[in-house]
Amino acid sequence: MALSKEEILTGLAEIINEVAGIPTSDVQPEKSFTDDLDVDSLSMVEVVVAAEEKFGVRIPDDEVKNLKTVGDAVDYIANATVSA
């Protein structure tokens, strides 16, 4: 079953809150992981692994570098769950 982008955003916000301590209300699609949310590369790996488990998708390492904003990650996960 495909998740809505809203559901994916909520799930990602919970993951980012757990990994980086960022309030879920601050996790918005336009926010940059590094610039706005202060998620470093190590934390990003944790976010990706948790997202893969939560959403049942695979995010290859070479794709992770393209996920600059929360919205990029939401779109990637939405597309990956549709094609899975």
Curated annotation (Swiss-Prot):
Alphabetic keyword roster: Cytoplasm, Fatty acid biosynthesis, Fatty acid metabolism, Lipid biosynthesis, Lipid metabolism, Phosphopantetheine, Phosphoprotein
An example Gene Ontology CC term for this record: membrane
Subcellular location, record wording: Cytoplasm
Biological process annotations from GO: lipid A biosynthetic process
Xref: PROSITE patterns: CARRIER (PS50075)
Keyword Thylakoid tagged: no
Residue ranges occupied by any Carrier domain in the UniProt entry: 6-81
Main location: cytoplasm
Matches recorded under Gene3D superfamilies: ACP-like (1.10.1200.10)
Modified how: 4'-phosphopantetheine is transferred from CoA to a specific serine of apo-ACP by AcpS. This modification is essential for activity because fatty acids are bound in thioester linkage to the sulfhydryl of the prosthetic group.
GO molecular function: acyl binding; acyl carrier activity
Pathway: Lipid metabolism; fatty acid biosynthesis
Reported function: Carrier of the growing fatty acid chain in fatty acid biosynthesis.
Protein name as catalogued: Acyl carrier protein
Originating organism: Acidothermus cellulolyticus (strain ATCC 43068 / DSM 8971 / 11B)
Gene that encodes the chain: acpP
